[in-house]
């Protein structure tokens, strides 16, 4: 998996064929084609068939692999490929126990970490408040749109 992650982020191509995306994602071509047909990967029709833009493949990969795994795989090159505001940071909060239980149960049901579930929910929060936060924090709008 580390090799796939490093290839995708450190050796990006403008677009990937279905087969190329399958290789870089470590998936079967039929599986990638299924994700395209389901609308989870949005391709562009060309004379040579459907291609997937790099940003689309990266967005999909960020759901396929945890961000912790991606950042660990990129090691020293992390800062060169993922913007600072997009990189993981530690946050300690105190919330009611029922919210923690809810996060843990949902994470377990989805096969994800509590961090991943909470990050997804906070992305929605950040998106809702982005018009204001974008005026307060330089680079916020770009981070919210990354990898576009």
Residue ranges and their predicted role:
Residues 31, 92, 116-117:
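Residues in the helix-turn-helix
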Residues 24-51:
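Major-groove DNA-recognition helix of helix-turn-helix-type DNA-binding domains
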Residues 17-18, 53, 113:
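Residues that mark the N-terminal boundary/hinge immediately upstream of a DNA-recognition element
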Residues 23, 44, 96-116:
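Surface-exposed, Lys/Arg-rich phosphate-binding patches that contact polyanionic backbones
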Residues 55-89:
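A short, Lys/Arg-enriched interface patch at domain edges and termini
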Residues 77, 127-148:
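Short, positively charged interaction helices/loops
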Residues 57-58, 112-136:
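Short, basic amphipathic alpha-helical segments that act as recognition/interaction helices
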Residues 2-31:
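Polyanion-binding surface elements
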């Amino acid at each position: 998996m580390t090799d796939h992650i490093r290839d995708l982020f450190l050796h990006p191509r403008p677009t990937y064929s279905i087969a190329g995306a399958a290789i870089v994602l470590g998936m079967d071509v039929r599986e990638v084609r299924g994700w395209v047909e389901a609308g989870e990967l949005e391709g562009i029709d060309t004379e040579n068939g459907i291609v997937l833009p790099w940003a689309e493949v990266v967005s999909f990969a960020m759901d396929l692999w945890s961000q912790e795994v991606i950042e660990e795989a990129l090691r020293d090159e992390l800062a060169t490929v993922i913007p600072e505001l997009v990189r993981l940071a530690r946050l300690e909060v105190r919330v009611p126990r029922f919210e923690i239980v809810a996060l843990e149960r949902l994470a377990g049901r989805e096969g994800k970490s509590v961090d991943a579930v909470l990050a997804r929910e906070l992305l929605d929060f950040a998106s809702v408040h982005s018009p204001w936060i974008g005026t307060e924090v330089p680079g916020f709008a770009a981070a919210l749109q990354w990898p576009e």
